[in-house]
């Protein structure tokens, strides 16, 4: 038997953010903690969300102290703000960082404790406080998944939480909220979405439904990501990417991820690098190794990226898929080496990051479990 998790209500398409007030009112909630970041708080996006809330008579208080790669302190401060203002539900507004912070705030609000208590698989006992998750980037799919990531500042580790009790009640994916996103952010989040779809397709946890979802996501990303990066106001491309992340999010939410994410989490935790960029740089490195172990799994990846696999060997399909991934990454402007991001090999703590990657919650989803030495070698390929 396979369990399939997805929010109960999912609003997708142009202008759907205008409907949130009526949905919240019908559900009987009164006051929201609106979790976001400083950029969105000062942008044109926030009024597009607060306007329908005001019209529906829904009260809210804005909590914008969420950093990129949200920390334990961000979460505990959010929990304090929620309690001080007597909020009975949460609205998360943003990309992966506000979404992840809101998920952890939700779980702690009903279960108590601290973020570290929930690292790992399904550690909470009670359903979290209701969350209306409004996404503003086409990448993480955090608005529809049971996964969230919080950085432990003291240990310099990204803690991966997989918890069905953190699942949002309502997800909102409105492409009109994404047109102002700059090209580098669009590229990074889009490559994160591609990583989700590819990892979910080749993981041993993949099954019929999730495989179809991953394939659809990969096809859409190849078609629409370059367009969205080239012209952020290409609303058709933005809508295509919204559809891609919804499909890919449903896939990895239920099939799992792999070692690309395990290694990328460490780069973000220690060096505060953009998660999507880290995933994009690592994706061909890890999938090249995965293809040696499970080459047949890459026939679907290659087909989704444009190859007719008829008459081709598994190895030929895998080589094509990895080359296409590298080409797409280059097309949208992703750096190839960590030195381009200001990280020098002589300063890189290979053993520390590699040891943490091996115990990351995403690692068991990979087609094979690398050794410490192999992981160090993978990181060395980024220099």
Briefly describe each language-model feature range.
Residues 308-383:
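C-terminal charged capping/lid subdomain of soluble metabolic enzymes
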Residues 1-63:
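An N-terminal, well-structured beta->alpha segment
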Residues 33-34, 89-91, 132:
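Conserved beta-strand elements of the Class I
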Residues 41-116, 227-238:
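N-terminal small/polar loop signature for handling phosphorylated ligands or for N-terminal nucleophile
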Residues 17-20, 42-45, 72-73, 97-103, ...:
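Short glycine/serine/threonine-rich phosphate/pyrophosphate-binding segments
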Residues 200-327:
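Active-site segments that bind and position negatively charged phosphate/pyrophosphate groups
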Residues 18, 110-206, 297-300, 304:
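A glycine/threonine-rich phosphate-anchoring loop and its flanking beta-alpha core
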């Amino acid at each position: 038997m396979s369990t399939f998790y997805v929010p109960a209500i999912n609003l997708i398409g142009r202008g759907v953010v205008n409907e949130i007030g009526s949905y919240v009112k019908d559900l009987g909630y009164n006051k929201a903690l609106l979790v976001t970041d400083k950029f969105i708080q000062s942008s044109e996006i926030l009024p597009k969300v607060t306007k329908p809330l005001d019209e529906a008579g829904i009260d809210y208080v804005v909590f914008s102290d969420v950093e990129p790669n949200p920390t334990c302190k961000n979460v505990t401060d959010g929990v304090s703000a929620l309690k001080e203002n007597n909020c009975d539900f949460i609205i998360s507004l943003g990309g992966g960082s506000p979404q992840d912070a809101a998920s952890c705030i939700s779980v702690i609000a009903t279960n108590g404790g601290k973020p570290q208590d929930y690292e790992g698989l399904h550690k909470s006992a009670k359903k979290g406080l209701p969350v209306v998750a409004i996404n503003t980037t086409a990448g993480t799919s955090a608005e529809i998944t049971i996964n969230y990531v919080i950085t432990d500042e003291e240990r310099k580790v990204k803690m991966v939480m997989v918890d069905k009790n953190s699942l949002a009640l309502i997800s909102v994916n409105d492409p009109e909220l994404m047109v102002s996103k700059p090209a580098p952010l669009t590229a990074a989040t889009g490559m994160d979405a591609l990583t989700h779809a590819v990892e979910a397709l080749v993981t041993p946890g993949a099954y019929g439904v999730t495989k179809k979802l991953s394939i659809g996501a990969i096809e859409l990303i190849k078609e629409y990501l370059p367009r969205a990066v080239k012209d952020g106001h290409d609303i058709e491309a933005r809508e295509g990417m919204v559809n891609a992340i919804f499909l890919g999010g449903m896939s990895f939410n239920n099939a799992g991820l792999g070692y690309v994410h395990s290694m990328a989490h460490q780069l973000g935790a220690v060096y505060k690098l953009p998660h999507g960029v880290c995933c994009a740089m690592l994706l061909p490195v890890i999938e090249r190794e995965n293809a040696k172990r499970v080459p047949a799994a890459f026939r679907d990846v290659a087909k989704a990226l444009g190859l007719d696999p008829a008459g081709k060997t598994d190895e030929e399909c895998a080589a094509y898929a990895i080359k296409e991934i590298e080409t797409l990454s280059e097309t949208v402007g992703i750096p190839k080496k960590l030195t381009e991001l200001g990280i020098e090999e002589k300063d890189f703590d290979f053993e520390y990051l590699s040891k943490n990657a091996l115990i990351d919650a995403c690692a068991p989803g990979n087609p094979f479990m690398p050794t410490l030495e192999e992981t160090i070698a993978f990181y060395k390929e980024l220099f």
